[in-house]
Amino acid sequence: MDTSRVYGNVKTFRSPGHKQASFPSLSTDACRCPHWHHLALKLGCATLILLLLTLIGLSVFVRFLVQKPLIEKCSMAAQENGTEPTGRSAILECPRHWQPHRNKCLIISQISRPWAEGLVACSMKEATLLIIENEEELKFVQNILKGRQQLFFIGLNYVQTEMTWKWINGSVLKPNILRITGSEVENSCALISHTEVFSDSCSSDNHWICQKTLKHV
């Protein structure tokens, strides 16, 4: 058998134009994103985070601005109403047998002594002789004295060296608050009745009126 002829037939059987199919190879660099893409992505994420934090900060700030006037208003209301820091309303209360009036507590003595002794007696009660601050308070005191025939020392005496009436706190009597009937001489003290205010000797025996400031309980 002629081997050259067989080999030639085999070669003749194959199509001379046939070639094996091949796929183009992809470069490894083609699958990689450019470096600036990564940089842009990082910058974008950082920007979004920064914007989010800014929005949160603005939200908190705006809420604070909105609530601040309300907080201040509540704080002022708490001070005016005498509320305690715990939020419970503080009660203003006078001791037993004391008469409340605005921010004061008043009490009338049951005994008669000179003005100086009345001053000491009030001090022992952590109080002072009555200081009348305005016409409204004068009317209130005279109203609670209705039906009483006695006169009552108050914290007002005549200072001869200054030739004027002064309260025990050092303030000068204002004539528009009350007028005193009687002499203006040394050792003169003021006494109040349910109708008038009189001048009498500080050494005379009379009742008196004490006052103290209302306390929180």
Curated annotation (Swiss-Prot):
PROSITE patterns: C_TYPE_LECTIN_2. Disulfide bonds join 122-210, 189-202. GO terms for biological process: regulation of natural killer cell mediated cytotoxicity. It is a single-pass type II membrane protein. A motif (LCK-binding motif) lies at residues 31-34. One of its GO terms (molecular function) is carbohydrate binding. Keywords: Disulfide bond, Lectin, Membrane, Signal-anchor, Transmembrane, Transmembrane helix. Residues 101-211 form the C-type lectin domain. This is Killer cell lectin-like receptor subfamily B member 1F. The lineage of its organism: Eukaryota, Metazoa, Chordata, Craniata, Vertebrata. The gene is Klrb1f.
